[in-house]
A protein has these predicted regions:
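Bacterial Sec-dependent N-terminal signal peptides
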Residues: 1-26, 241, 403-404
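Structural motif corresponding to the intra-repeat A-B loop/turn of tetratricopeptide repeats
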Residues: 31, 67, 144, 192, ...
Length: 404
């Protein structure tokens, strides 16, 4: 009885294998209709008997390439309209299937089942030839707001360089576009909040000489998150960005904020002075002025802010506002001191005169900032309210109504 059951089992297995083989044969017979062929071969990709045959994956990739070629041709025909979703999806599937074919084929070569690979060269040539078209797919998806597909296409472009079939392709590895499109993969990953992908592609993309700053910014955002962030990595990335892209204000601003928060103003001044030695931009001057302000070196800070004003470039309104701060905030220290004194205390009146004197100095600078940037109330609004309250109640009432 056992022998009979065993024989039946063998017959059933043989029939099942035969059925899967016939699926592959059917798919081959439909190669002139690639979409039908692609659908027909799908069961063979999951069945252990046929899924372990590199030819199955080669055929699946060929069908996807044929679908891609048909859609791509429409782009070049007068009045032709291609289905771009189908176009790029078939390209991505072709990549997946050819790479799987190579993986299985190489395993059989290493085990001795095959003497040498049959499909590697042809697959590699196809992948390399069509590789740039992945960028088109990524750009198309990104512009549509489909960041998942954008990440898929840009990621494939970058990842394929490290596939075993390209292990000896030094030209491909040296392609500067790898880092460029790793930047775009990073941007897409950042939009998806896919931290792992940001870190993976960001560390490649940061090496691009022109666009690498984008990858570093995304890395900084990822490491700077309150939950799951890494403050040490954040600082490392910000420092790297400052060194590699000193003209990008994002990194300079962040590193200076860090120095101020940590009480490391001297370190910040040393770094900003190095940057100013190479390029005296309004932003670098502004940062230096703020650092001097933080050290309470108000006269030196005012001199720097006046330089920004005399250059008449960017940040002029901000410079006027910061000069106002150099008088307003020292006055606030005296205001706090007076709050602890009795009104009949001789020191109280002396302090009141000092407060008014400092407010009088600050007033024209805040008013100039208001004139230059009336919509940016953070530069002048509350400061002028405080000053007018002390110096001129009519102006206070008018400004209070204006501010709402």
């Amino acid at each position: 009885m056992r022998k009979v059951l065993f024989t039946v089992a063998l017959l059933l297995t043989a029939c099942f294998v035969s059925a899967q083989v016939s699926v592959v044969k059917e798919a081959k017979s439909l190669k002139s209709k690639p979409e039908e062929a692609a659908k027909a071969i799908e069961p063979a990709l999951t069945n252990p008997e046929t899924a372990n045959d590199p030819e199955t994956w080669k055929l699946a990739g060929d069908f996807q390439k044929a679908i891609y070629d048909e859609e791509n041709m429409k782009l070049y025909l007068p009045g032709g309209q291609a289905d771009t979703t189908k176009l790029y999806n078939s390209l991505a599937k072709m990549y997946d299937f050819y790479l799987k074919c190579d993986e299985i084929e190489q395993a059989k070569v290493q085990s001795g089942e095959l003497k040498k690979p049959k499909f590697r060269k042809k697959n590699a040539d196809a992948l390399k030839t069509l590789r740039l078209n992945l960028v088109n797919g990524g750009g198309d998806a990104y512009n549509k707001g489909d960041y998942a597909d954008a990440l898929k296409y840009f990621g494939l472009f970058v990842d394929v360089v490290n596939e075993p079939m390209f292990a000896d392709d030094d030209e491909l590895k040296a392609d500067t576009l790898n880092a460029l499109y790793a930047c775009y993969a990073t941007l897409a990953a950042n939009m998806l909040k896919d931290n792992q992908a940001v870190i993976k592609y960001g560390n490649i993309g940061k090496n691009h000489k022109e666009e690498g700053y984008r990858a570093l910014m995304c890395l900084a955002e990822t490491y700077g998150q309150k939950e799951g962030g890494d403050s040490a990595k954040w600082l490392e990335v910000i420092k790297e960005g400052t060194e590699l892209f000193p003209k990008q204000e994002y990194f300079v601003g962040n590193i200076m904020d860090y120095y101020i928060q940590k009480g490391m103003v001297d370190e910040g001044l040393a770094q900003i002075n190095k940057l100013l030695a190479t390029s005296e931009t309004p932003y670098y001057l502004y940062v230096k002025g703020i650092l001097l302000y933080e050290k309470k070196q108000y006269d030196d800070a005012v001199a720097i802010f006046n330089k920004i004003i005399s250059n008449n470039g960017d940040l002029v309104a901000e410079a006027y506002s910061k000069i106002g701060d150099c008088y307003f905030f020292p006055a606030q220290i005296i205001v706090e001191e007076n709050a602890k004194l009795a009104i009949d205390d001789p020191k109280y009146n002396e302090n009141e005169n000092k407060i008014k004197e400092l407010y009088e100095k600050a007033k024209p600078y805040y008013e100039k900032a208001k004139e230059l940037k009336p919509d940016n109330k953070a530069l002048w609004g509350n400061y002028l309210l405080n000053i007018y309250w002390k110096l001129n109640r009519a102006e206070y009432d008018s400004l209070e109504k204006e501010l709402g």
